[in-house]
């Protein structure tokens, strides 16, 4: 082979190799940006994700009965989480649920005139509350992490004490229930919209070893710790409104959770009043 032909072949090989390397690099960059980029705040989530895709991650903090903070872990173990990319470690909780939220037995049921109908009704309410206060909250909340605030779609949990206003009955119990179910655990989140507080309104699914995949909003309705969302703004159900209303009806007819009360003010009514 002549020297000129040899040089031409080498140049062609180098060109082909360069094209392959460039293509592979661009493919890796595209794959990483599209599938492995971590979203650290609500506004990081691309519009293409909403209503179509699910995000995987860990619950690092639960501050209320219908919202929590979500640490996004795209790709899970295959995305390097736990061996290449650090996952926030939770701190074990030594306090009981009652100490975390205060003793609900001494709380007023409402901050307006409401008279219980006999001791039996009050006793039933306290009994209903106690089953939730006994739930185990295994971890403490982790704060100051790059997390997305998540608002559960389709439901409204009783309000806890905020800005000097008293808590609604079962507000603390809803918080404890939610902490027991998801704090420190992995969940799947389907973004639906962004609310006025810059929270991601989402449908949330978690794994239960005894019942498979669970819809978190639906489970709260079943246990009588939330009502179907009444607001007209940022109303999201992900095509499950009828199902949510059906299980709310069942919980109400069976007097589960907050429905044990003879007179009940919904979270929406409470927020309008205060």
Curated annotation (Swiss-Prot):
EC number(s) reported in the record: 3.1.-.-
Record-annotated membrane-spanning stretches: 15-32
Phenotypic effect of disruption: Leads to long chronological lifespan.
Keywords (A to Z) from UniProt: Calcium, Endonuclease, Hydrolase, Membrane, Metal-binding, Mitochondrion, Nuclease, Transmembrane, Transmembrane helix
Inducing stimuli: By DNA-damaging agent methyl methanesulphonate (MMS) (at protein level).
Binding positions (Ca(2+)): 156
Predominant location: mitochondrion
InterPro entries per UniProt: SNase_OB-fold_sf, Staphylococal_nuclease_OB-fold
Active site per UniProt: 151, 159, 199
Enzyme type, top EC level: hydrolase
Superkingdom of this protein's organism: Eukaryota
Membrane topology, from the record: Single-pass membrane protein
GO molecular function, one term: endonuclease activity
GO cellular component: membrane; mitochondrion
Intracellular or extracellular location(s): Mitochondrion; Membrane
Miscellaneous notes: Present with 704 molecules/cell in log phase SD medium.
Family: Belongs to the LCL3 family.
Protein name: Probable endonuclease LCL3
Gene name of this polypeptide: LCL3
């Amino acid at each position: 082979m002549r020297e000129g032909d040899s040089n031409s072949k080498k140049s062609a090989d180098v060109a082909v190799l360069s094209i392959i390397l460039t293509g592979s690099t661009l493919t890796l960059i595209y794959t990483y940006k599209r599938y492995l980029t971590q979203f650290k705040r609500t506004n990081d989530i691309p519009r293409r994700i909403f209503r179509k895709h699910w995000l995987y991650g860990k619950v690092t903090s639960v501050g209320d009965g219908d919202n929590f903070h979500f640490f996004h872990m795209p790709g899970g173990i295959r995305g390097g989480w736990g061996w290449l990319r650090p996952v926030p470690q939770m701190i074990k909780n030594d306090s009981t649920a009652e100490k975390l939220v205060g003793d609900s037995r001494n709380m007023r049921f409402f901050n307006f005139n409401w008279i219980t109908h006999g001791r039996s009704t009050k006793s039933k309410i306290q009994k209903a509350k106690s089953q939730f206060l006994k739930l185990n909250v295994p971890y403490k909340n982790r704060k100051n992490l790059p997390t997305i605030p998540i608002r559960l779609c389709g439901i409204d949990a009783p309000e806890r004490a905020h800005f000097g206003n008293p808590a609604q009955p079962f507000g603390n119990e809803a918080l404890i229930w939610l902490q027991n179910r998801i704090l420190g655990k992995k969940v799947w989140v389907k973004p639906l919209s962004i609310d006025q507080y810059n929270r991601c309104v989402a449908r949330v699914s978690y794994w239960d070893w005894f019942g498979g995949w669970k819809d978190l909003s639906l489970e709260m309705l079943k246990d009588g710790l939330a009502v179907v969302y009444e607001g007209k703004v940022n109303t999201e159900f992900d095509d499950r409104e009828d199902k949510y209303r059906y299980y709310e009806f069942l919980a109400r007819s069976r007097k589960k959770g907050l429905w044990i009360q003879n007179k009940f003010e919904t979270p929406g009514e409470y927020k309008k009043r205060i």
